[in-house]
């Protein structure tokens, strides 16, 4: 910009005509950029000063000022209203003018150019205060500092003037504004003054209320005074009344009133400036007084502000004098050149001044500089001035949402198709049959059956996340899926912790919203175990993510009810803006299992009873619950761009507030919502009319829809200013599709908004099922706002960004809003990719996952055949976390890669032979090749591609040149021909290359364990190991080469590589007369069968001929001299002399010495004489490597990297050890990058993960992060079902009242009483249902006798026949209550499961109560039963049953038909068995012998011994049975009769030689059915037949059918009776005499432990009816049980499949038997305990498996150490699991010390 001859800077007293809000928004936005640092400082200081001044106001005035984070947001409200209007207007004008001035200089990047010799400042009224700040400044930084104080004075002046003025005339009562000044035109100043003087004299108004002239010029006069006085004055004076006059926008009082203000007033206003601005600060630029037209006389800041204050309060403005002053300044400037006017837009006053200049100086050039126009400019990518100024980028997302939306793409498909995921509560959550009552009469039952649920909530890859199955099962599914989606979101983001500064683990935090604890409170609480706290407490959801990924940033779990998910995102954003983290993972979690929450929300009238959320529908009646898990990865925009991330959208602002003024805590509040929107808009500096999409909270409630529609329309589509037709605002509400995810609702809405940005489409709204709700504002269409009722394109305008808002409100009153904009448009750098070969790596933590990952990638490639291989390589290598199971390849094209992938998948051995990388990374040895590998261009591609390598080479080359040697770069980059080169150039270029390569390998993250150099290569090895410096190495190599050239003759000697050992060569040469006298020397022992010899050319030629005649391969080396021979003798002394001054240091990396044949660690072994000897003596490569092997420095896993132009040393290593892993750095006739790719893949597969980020860094901005398929999880279902109806049962205990103590006196008569059924406690009979609760005492004589009739381990143990009789008894009783006319009742006792053995107490006189609960439903002809232990002291019933079954009432004719079809088969097997007995092939047992065999496990009382004779063959048997004649009590079917006809199965399992009865015993957990065609007869004769077989799907389990025959007819059957094999050593544990406290203990240990037993589901409580959910889609909803005055126990459901840890007596242990091999020794027993307690298979406990990988953490370590002590008698500390981190180390310790 040319410097003007003179200039005036004009500070007006009016705002520009631009959109004032827009100007301040733009100022605010620019201030966040580092380019505008001083603008940012000025605005921050001005904001701070205004806040300080407001805080000093009286309370009633403070309340008039809205909250503001920056002064730039104050224009968003009508700041001119109220008593502070003048103060705000004055301050904002000062801020705007000074902010625009500062911003102009920073935007244009120009120096401060206001020269006092040619610049004058001028202005009017408040504008003079802005001018004062410039007048006192010598730099732009001064303007920022002093300007803030000018803002203070402006504000104080406005406050003071308004305060004084209201004392002169009160404001209007209706709040309307009245002007305190009018401008009159067409009259002179004198004429106006005369009229006013006359008026003031006639009316005799007090002096201070008079009307006066405040400003005048040639054409106009400003008349000022109290509004009523002005009105009266104009009415009094005909001249004024008929003059041309207009009111001015002066609404807050009087200035320029000498009659009103005194020096004291001026001091009060100006005094504040003195405290900050030194009064001695000099005035640097002249500032014209608007009263005198001359510069203020002040010399210092204090004087200047006082003079300005005096003028503003008491002086009259004379525009003509101001113009004259400016003209005088113009006149003083040089007559040639331009005169510049600097202003803030144009005004009428300024136009007049310009006209005057043009008139008086027509020959003068004129220039204008506008200080406002810059604010509309685009200054490139914003560089935030602070963390708080950053925009935030969302770079990854993942989800598990209803309707199978298990990833974002599936979620989008659901939205695009307009699907509704409504369904009923799945059975795995809770049983609607028992927990649903639409009438609301059943306490704690849900009144709605609807919801939206995710698929397979229990499925989880526990091994991936280092969790044991036991821990996984106890861990809340929400927490598990938080882990999973966090990983998937990171995967989408290409986030590798530690890859970049923004992803350092200590700078990564997690923020998740969670509002319920269903799993902890319901499912996991049924068996509170080791992992109850870490598995269920909310904080662990985040803590587990941080711990697993090793993030040490902040970890917050947030509960703000329904807005928790989005509030977590907002908190995460706040952490980024505060600098507490650099990357955050945020989300929301909700998995529904607890019917209590359904009941609570229903009773609170939150939930719809009719189905899905009907957002904006007139019939909206509440929300529908939904599961949901969502995670996003967020970082600052500048970090995301630097990290080459894919940016899904950008967060401009996020805020949360509370509806404190709502009518109730749960009622929304439009005012609070609007305030929150405005705060977000202010934070971002965004015009609400620029927002084109709002994702509503939209729950579908009458209140919620009404309030949100009002708040959104008022802020984003107000009536005025109204949106244009092309500015339509679209609305959406995802809850219409997938319900209300509660804590996950906000994150779900955010995910939808991100997809809308990605897909450029707004999916259709499906929430209006009937018609739009009439409560919605009627004029929305006129405001150009509405729901997208069809899939609506949402294109991104060219060169612009779309804006969207996401809302989420909490039921507790919280409101969270996030403002989003488009990601920056990315222009991909398009350059030629010189990398012809790319590494491709894929990994997983299991073979199954790896194979699936490869299959997914192959499928993706098939669908994307044009994918860029470089992008794919970059994504898979640099932007993926790598795991232990690995696949890798170096590919030259997509087609070649596809072929490789298919080949791997088609090769079954590939997966079978795959092994995880070792926990300990292999050692790495660098081998440095000698000069024989030299060729031109040996590092060409590396030099061109990698700046790090290039820098290393250039620096080393510079050193070489400074040492006086030629440049080696032309050799390395191939710019010279590949012809003969001097020894100096050859040897230096090889050395430079090798040192640079070694450092490059380190740069790629490869840690070097040792180095070895071959001949010349030793110098590079020494430099890399730190023995000598790189400079010293180059100096020695160069000088040695020069000495060789000077003192040795090229071609006189040569070197020969011979494929034979040294001894073989000597024998052949010595044995031939032609060669015996020839002299040669051994130069190198490269391998046992590879030797290099040297000597004179003649001798070597002859020796070669002799050797080749003996078919020995020989190769003449292309070297000019014979190193390591006598030819080197002339240089040795000089070489040693050159090396003597060098200080040789101890190596930082061990050196393998081919000269010494040892490993060098010290500083004394390598010295000048070493170099002399190494030049002359043999290179014994073999000895060096063998020494390293002996020392343990290298082993079979060691990776050998050949560092040289060609892998010569690599072939030598292979010659010594054929199994060695060797890789190359460079290879002759192969592109360096192809070689490097292959080598890096080899290292990666060996477990030495390269620093892929560095490998791709040179071209990172050219590559794109691809959106590849997600990780393939190796999932198992970890789900603890909710068992029973205890959430309903607890309603029986009102307000903490205890149940009455259990009465066991049996004094009250009972309608039903037998030997086992003692007292009815509850009985409810309806038309088609009946419920019965029975109390019995197992210590009752009849019951106790039945127990002792079946003794195990000297204990009376309840046999299944006891539960069968009780079931038949209750079943017939209840059936006859409902069907009194029934003649015979035929019952099928089905699905009997006994989970805990009932052992008789030993103590006589004790009480051992149990409760039987039964519910019969005639509509299903079934009755569900469950047995519970009860407390003898309190009567409290255990939470979980110990046995369950279902009795089905069936037609016996069907049984007969079934059995008739089978009878010939059964009879045929009986006949075959009896024939085998005749033939002596089967055992025929008498009664005594049979029951003697039975004593192996069970000792039966005589009445139970009904089998007279048994024929037994392996697992098949038939028995003759005679029942005892006595019933011995009151029964339906005596247990001893049932046992007699059925316990043949037990004899087969526990007495057959086909069973291992020495080590095991067999017990039954139940059967699938038990039917009797007719009642058993006293003394009756029967036959029993059974054949048992192992169950293939369940280890250690056997099953069979027991047929009961009377004659030739089948009259009964026990179907699918099961027996489990249990180690005999556990007999004492499971069947020990019970203590008196046994029942109380069982009440606490009620978890089932019959592992892997599939539980059957009881029949529904009532017949279903059809309830419409959506058109054409009826859903069966069961009716609830009717409520009675006496609350009946709800129907029973079967118990959980979960295993108990084994503390309580059980029928089947939670262990897996692997045969005798694992029983032997302490180690085997310990492994069994580990397997049982963790839920792992013993096979998984391999020696190399680490406890971390197995999920054995500190808690499990404590458990295992206690189990070892209690069960095995082994005392070990839990810390042993840290000291011995793998199974192998642990077993070694156990073998050594136990």
Curated annotation (Swiss-Prot):
Residues 1482-1628 are annotated as: C-terminal hotdog fold. Residues 1314-1633 are annotated as: Product template (PT) domain. Its EC number is 2.3.1.-. Residues 1318-1454 are annotated as: N-terminal hotdog fold. Pathway: Secondary metabolite biosynthesis. Binds 1 phosphopantetheine covalently. Residues 1717-1794 form the Carrier domain. Non-reducing polyketide synthase; part of the gene cluster that mediates the biosynthesis of neosartoricin, a prenylated anthracenone that exhibits T-cell antiproliferative activity, suggestive of a physiological role as an immunosuppressive agent. The non-reducing polyketide synthase nscA probably synthesizes and cyclizes the decaketide backbone. The hydrolase nscB then mediates the product release through hydrolysis followed by spontaneous decarboxylation. The prenyltransferase nscD catalyzes the addition of the dimethylallyl group to the aromatic C5. This is Non-reducing polyketide synthase nscA. The gene is nscA.
């Amino acid at each position: 910009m040319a410097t003007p001859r003179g200039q005036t800077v004009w500070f007006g007293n009016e705002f520009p005509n631009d959109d004032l809000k827009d100007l301040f928004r733009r100022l605010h936005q620019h201030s966040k950029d580092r380019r505008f640092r001083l603008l940012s400082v000025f605005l921050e200081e001005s904001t701070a000063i205004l806040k300080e001044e407001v805080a000093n106001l009286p309370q009633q005035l403070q309340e008039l000022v809205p909250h503001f984070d920056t002064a730039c947001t104050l224009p968003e409200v009508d700041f001119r209203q109220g008593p502070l209007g003048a103060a705000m207007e004055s301050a904002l004008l000062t801020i705007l003018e000074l902010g625009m001035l500062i911003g102009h200089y920073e935007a244009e990047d120009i120096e401060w150019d206001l020269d006092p010799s040619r610049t004058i400042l001028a202005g009017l009224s408040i504008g003079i205060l802005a001018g004062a700040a410039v007048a006192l400044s010598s730099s732009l930084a001064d303007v920022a500092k002093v300007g803030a104080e000018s803002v203070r004075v402006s504000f104080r002046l406005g406050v003071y003037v308004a305060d004084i003025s209201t004392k002169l005339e009160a404001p209007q009562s209706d709040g309307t504004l009245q002007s305190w000044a009018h401008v009159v035109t067409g009259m002179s100043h004198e004429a106006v003054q005369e009229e006013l003087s006359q008026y003031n004299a006639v009316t005799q108004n007090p002096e201070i209320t008079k009307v006066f002239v405040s400003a005048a010029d040639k054409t106009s006069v400003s008349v000022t005074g109290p509004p009523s006085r002005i009105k009266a004055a104009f009415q009094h004076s005909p001249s004024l009344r008929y003059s041309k006059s207009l009111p001015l926008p002066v609404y807050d009082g009087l200035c320029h009133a000498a009659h009103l203000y005194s020096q004291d007033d001026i001091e009060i206003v100006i005094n504040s400036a003195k405290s900050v601005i030194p009064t001695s600060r000099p005035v640097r630029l002249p500032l014209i007084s608007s009263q005198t037209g001359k510069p203020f006389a002040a010399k210092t800041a204090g004087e200047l502000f006082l003079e300005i204050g005096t003028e503003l309060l008491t002086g009259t403005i004379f525009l003509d004098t101001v113009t004259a002053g400016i003209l005088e300044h113009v006149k003083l400037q040089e007559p040639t050149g331009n005169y510049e006017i600097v202003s803030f837009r144009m005004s009428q006053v300024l136009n007049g001044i310009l006209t005057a200049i043009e008139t008086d100086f027509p020959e003068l050039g004129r220039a204008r500089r506008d200080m406002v126009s810059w604010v509309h400019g685009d200054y490139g990518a914003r560089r935030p001035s602070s963390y708080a100024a950053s925009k935030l980028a969302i770079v990854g997302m993942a989800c598990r949402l209803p309707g199978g939306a298990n990833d974002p793409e599936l979620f989008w498909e659901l939205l695009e198709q307009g699907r509704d995921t409504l369904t009923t509560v799945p059975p795995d959550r809770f049983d609607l049959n028992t927990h649903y009552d639409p009438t609301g009469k059943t306490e704690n039952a849900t009144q709605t059956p609807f919801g939206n649920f995710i698929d397979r909530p229990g499925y989880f890859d526990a091994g991936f996340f280092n969790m044991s199955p036991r821990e996984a099962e106890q861990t809340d599914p929400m927490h598990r899926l938080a882990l999973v989606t966090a990983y998937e979101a990171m995967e989408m983001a290409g986030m590798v912790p530690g890859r970049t500064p923004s992803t350092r683990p200590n700078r990564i935090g997690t923020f998740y919203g969670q509002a319920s604890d269903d799993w902890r409170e319901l499912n996991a609480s049924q068996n509170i175990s080791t992992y109850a706290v870490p598995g269920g407490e909310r904080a662990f959801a985040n803590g587990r993510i941080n711990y697993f990924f090793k993030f040490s940033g902040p970890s917050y779990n947030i509960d703000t009810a329904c807005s928790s998910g989005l509030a977590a995102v907002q908190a995460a954003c706040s952490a980024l803006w505060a600098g507490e983290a650099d990357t955050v993972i945020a989300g929301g979690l909700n998995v529904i299992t607890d019917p209590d929450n359904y009941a609570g929300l229903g009773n609170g009238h939150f939930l719809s009873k009719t189905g899905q959320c009907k957002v904006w529908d007139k019939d909206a009646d509440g929300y529908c619950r939904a599961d949901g898990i969502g995670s996003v990865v967020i970082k600052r925009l500048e970090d995301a761009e630097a990290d080459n991330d894919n940016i899904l959208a950008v967060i401009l602002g996020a805020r949360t507030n509370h509806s404190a003024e709502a009518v109730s805590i749960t009622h929304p509040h439009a005012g609070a919502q609007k305030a929150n929107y405005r705060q977000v808009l202010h934070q971002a500096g965004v015009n609400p009319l620029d927002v084109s999409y709002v994702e509503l909270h939209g729950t579908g409630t009458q209140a919620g829809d009404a309030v949100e529609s009002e708040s959104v329309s008022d802020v984003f589509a107000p009536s005025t200013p109204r949106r244009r037709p092309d500015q339509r605002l679209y609305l959406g509400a995802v809850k219409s599709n997938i319900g209300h995810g509660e804590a996950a609702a906000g994150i779900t809405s955010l995910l939808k908004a991100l997809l809308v940005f990605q897909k450029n489409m707004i999916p259709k709204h499906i929430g209006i099922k009937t018609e739009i709700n009439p409560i919605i504002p009627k004029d929305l269409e006129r405001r150009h706002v509405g729901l997208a009722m069809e899939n609506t394109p949402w294109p991104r305008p060219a060169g612009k960004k779309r804006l969207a808002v996401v809302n989420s409100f909490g039921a507790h009153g919280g409101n969270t809003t996030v403002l989003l904009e488009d990601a920056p448009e990315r222009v991909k750098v398009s350059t030629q990719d010189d990398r012809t070969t790319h590494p491709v790596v894929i990994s997983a933590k299991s073979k199954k996952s790896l194979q699936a990952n490869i299959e997914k990638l192959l499928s993706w490639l098939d669908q994307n055949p044009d994918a860029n291989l470089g992008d794919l390589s970059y994504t898979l290598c640099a932007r993926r976390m790598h795991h232990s199971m690995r696949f890798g390849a170096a590919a030259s094209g997509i087609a070649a890669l596809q072929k490789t992938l298919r080949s791997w998948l088609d090769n079954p051995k590939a997966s079978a032979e795959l092994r995880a990388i070792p926990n300990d990374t292999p050692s790495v040895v660098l081998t440095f090749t000698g000069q024989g590998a030299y060729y031109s261009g040996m590092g060409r591609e590396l030099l061109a591609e990698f700046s790090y390598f290039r820098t290393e080479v250039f620096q080393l080359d510079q050193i070489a040149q400074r040492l006086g040697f030629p440049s080696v770069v032309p050799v390395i980059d191939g710019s010279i021909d590949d012809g003969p080169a001097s020894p100096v150039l050859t040897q230096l270029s090889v050395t430079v290359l090798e040192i640079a390569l070694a450092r490059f390998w380190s740069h790629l993250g490869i840690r070097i364990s040792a180095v070895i150099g071959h001949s010349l290569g030793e110098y590079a090895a020494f430099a890399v190991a730190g023995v000598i410096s790189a400079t010293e190495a180059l100096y020695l190599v160069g000088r040695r080469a020069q000495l060789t050239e000077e003192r040795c003759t090229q071609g006189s000697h040569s070197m020969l590589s011979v494929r034979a050992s040294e001894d073989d060569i000597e024998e052949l040469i010595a044995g031939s007369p032609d060669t015996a006298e020839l002299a040669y020397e051994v130069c190198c022992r490269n391998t046992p069968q590879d030797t290099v010899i040297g000597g004179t050319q003649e001798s070597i030629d002859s020796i070669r001929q002799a050797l080749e005649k003996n078919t020995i391969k020989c190769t003449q080396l292309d070297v000019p001299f014979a190193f390591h021979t006598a030819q080197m003798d002339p240089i040795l002394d000089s070489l040693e002399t050159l090396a003597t001054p060098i200080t040789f240091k101890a190596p930082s990396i061990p050196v393998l010495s081919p000269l010494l044949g040892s490993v060098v660690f010290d500083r004394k072994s390598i010295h000048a004489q070493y170099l002399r000897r190494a030049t002359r003596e043999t290179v014994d490569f073999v000895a060096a490597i063998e020494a390293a092997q002996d020392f343990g420095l290298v082993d079979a896993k060691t990776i050998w990297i050949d560092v040289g132009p060609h892998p010569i040393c690599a072939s030598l290593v292979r010659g010594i050890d054929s199994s060695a892993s060797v890789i190359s750095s460079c290879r002759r006739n192969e592109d360096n990058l192809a070689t490097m790719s292959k080598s890096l893949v080899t290292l990666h597969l060996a477990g030495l993960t390269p620093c892929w980020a560095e490998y791709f860094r040179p071209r990172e901005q050219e590559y794109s992060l691809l959106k590849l398929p997600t990780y393939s999880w190796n999932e198992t279902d970890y789900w603890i079902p909710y068992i029973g109806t205890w959430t309903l049962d607890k309603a029986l205990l009102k307000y903490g009242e205890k149940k009455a103590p259990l009465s066991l006196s049996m004094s009250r008569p009972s309608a039903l009483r037998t030997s086992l059924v003692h007292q009815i406690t509850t009985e409810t009979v309806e038309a088609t249902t009946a419920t019965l609760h029975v109390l019995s005492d197992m210590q009752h004589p009849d019951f106790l006798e039945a127990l002792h009739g079946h003794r195990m381990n000297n204990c009376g143990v309840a046999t299944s026949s006891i539960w069968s009789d009780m079931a038949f008894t209750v079943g017939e009783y209840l059936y006859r209550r409902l069907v009194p006319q029934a003649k015979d009742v035929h019952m099928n006792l089905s699905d009997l499961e006994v989970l805990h053995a009932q052992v008789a107490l030993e103590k006589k006189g004790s009480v051992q109560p149990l409760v039987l609960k039964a519910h019969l439903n005639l509509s299903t002809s079934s009755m569900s039963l469950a047995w519970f232990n009860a407390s003898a002291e309190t009567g409290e019933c255990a939470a979980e049953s110990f046995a369950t079954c279902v009795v089905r009432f069936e037609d016996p004719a069907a049984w007969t038909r079934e059995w008739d079809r089978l009878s010939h088969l059964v009879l045929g097997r009986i006949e075959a068995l009896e024939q085998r007995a005749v033939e002596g092939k089967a055992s025929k047992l008498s009664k005594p012998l049979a029951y003697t065999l039975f004593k192996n496990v069970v000792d039966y009382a005589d009445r139970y011994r009904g089998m007279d004779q048994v024929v037994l063959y392996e697992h098949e048997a038939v028995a003759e049975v005679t029942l005892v004649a006595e019933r011995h009590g009151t029964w339906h079917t005596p247990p001893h009769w049932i046992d007699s006809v059925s316990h043949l199965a037990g004899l087969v399992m526990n007495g057959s030689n086909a069973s291992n009865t020495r080590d095991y015993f067999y017990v039954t957990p139940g059967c699938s059915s038990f039917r009797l065609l007719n009642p058993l007869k006293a003394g009756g004769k029967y036959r029993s037949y059974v054949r048992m077989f192992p169950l293939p799907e369940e280890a250690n389990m056997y099953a069979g059918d027991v047929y009961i025959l009377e004659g030739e007819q089948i009259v009964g059957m026990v179907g699918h009776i099961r027996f489990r094999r249990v180690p005999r050593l556990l007999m004492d544990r499971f069947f020990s005499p019970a203590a008196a406290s046994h029942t109380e203990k069982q009440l606490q240990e009620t978890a089932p432990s019959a592992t892997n037993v599939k539980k059957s589901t009881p029949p529904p409580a009532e017949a279903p009816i059809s309830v419409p959910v959506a058109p054409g889609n009826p859903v069966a909803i069961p009716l609830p049980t009717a409520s009675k005055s006496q609350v009946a126990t709800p129907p029973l459901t079967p118990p959980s499949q979960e295993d108990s840890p084994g503390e309580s007596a059980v029928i089947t242990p939670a262990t897996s038997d692997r045969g005798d091999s694992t029983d032997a020794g302490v180690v085997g027993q310990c492994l069994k305990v580990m397997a049982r307690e963790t839920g792992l298979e013993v096979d998984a406990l391999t020696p190399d498996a680490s406890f971390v990988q197995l999920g054995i953490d500190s808690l499990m370590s404590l458990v295992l150490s206690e189990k070892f002590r209690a069960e095995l008698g082994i005392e070990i500390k839990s810390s042993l699991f840290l000291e011995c981190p793998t199974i192998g180390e642990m077993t070694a310790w156990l073998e050594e010390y136990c």
